[in-house]
């Protein structure tokens, strides 16, 4: 594994040797030891948001999107209505989930470099009293933009509506306190800022809302009410759990706490982001977002203007030097993305910048 490239992506991402080694043990899915492992993971996850008094942690097999779909399908009644706030591809995915599930919804879309504002939400909720829930992406992974969650959450509370947060790319690195930010559900996953491996999502569901959600779900496997009720009764998952993923996440959480928890994880990622932005600027590559709305999770860069630049060739050359980047996901301009998260520090980020600079010279890309 020493020759494996560093994944500068928003997940899956580079994990530690300890996390990978945790997957070398096989677990019985009904065994008491594994049940205790699951309970410990959920307890530690709740502690990150100070949510044990107000929310249940409900784990679910699959990618983060599975958990997002489960949260909407379980917590939004079939006669509810979701206002989906969009400024990127993952907000659009939220709207598509509502459409496929048959949940009434409306959308409010801003430009990919424009956060939704609390004033926008205030106006939209005043104009449409039928809305029961608001769904938003905290950190929109398609650009790295950070939406103003605390301000928006207070507006939603004032209107008596309920908030569903996709915190896939922010949970564990950006502060979210359940005692200060009112939300019905917050969704995240194992393979992002916690530096576990992909394969498990989890939903922090407000206790009274989850208790009232029986019968809402469109799906047996994605019924969070049933999943929680079964776990509370037996300590077990309803269906075969991703045992190795859970074990890896448990180990990743131990390292998270050893590092210093959220403040330390946030600081490392912020240092990574600054090193990346400063280094790329020095070679002429422009970031898509202004610094004040850039989350230290993933950075979008404008592609060079030079005709000799082709992303596929650029990607393969950078990969050969030990770094895997991410293609752009914008509709209007050509970009590429570089993640700041995973088991990597500022020295690794500087090495990645050096590799990018060397590749651009090799490609004779001059018009940056």
Swiss-Prot record:
Gene3D superfamilies: Aspartate Aminotransferase, domain 1 (3.90.1150.10), Type I PLP-dependent aspartate aminotransferase-like (Major domain) (3.40.640.10)
Cofactor dependence: pyridoxal 5'-phosphate
GO biological process: organic phosphonate catabolic process
Protein origin, superkingdom: Bacteria
E.C. no: 2.6.1.37
Single GO MF descriptor: 2-aminoethylphosphonate-pyruvate transaminase activity
Modification type N6-(pyridoxal phosphate)lysine: residues: 192
Signal peptide segment: none
Enzyme class: transferase
Keywords tagged on the record: Aminotransferase, Pyridoxal phosphate, Pyruvate, Transferase
Catalysed reaction equations from the record: (2-aminoethyl)phosphonate + pyruvate = phosphonoacetaldehyde + L-alanine
InterPro entries (UniProt xref): Aminotrans_V_dom, NH2EtPonate_pyrv_transaminase, PyrdxlP-dep_Trfase, PyrdxlP-dep_Trfase_major, PyrdxlP-dep_Trfase_small, SP_NH2Trfase/AEP_transaminase
Function: Involved in phosphonate degradation.
Subunit structure and binding partners: Homodimer.
Family: Belongs to the class-V pyridoxal-phosphate-dependent aminotransferase family. PhnW subfamily.
Protein name: 2-aminoethylphosphonate--pyruvate transaminase
Organismal lineage: Bacteria, Pseudomonadati, Pseudomonadota, Gammaproteobacteria, Pseudomonadales
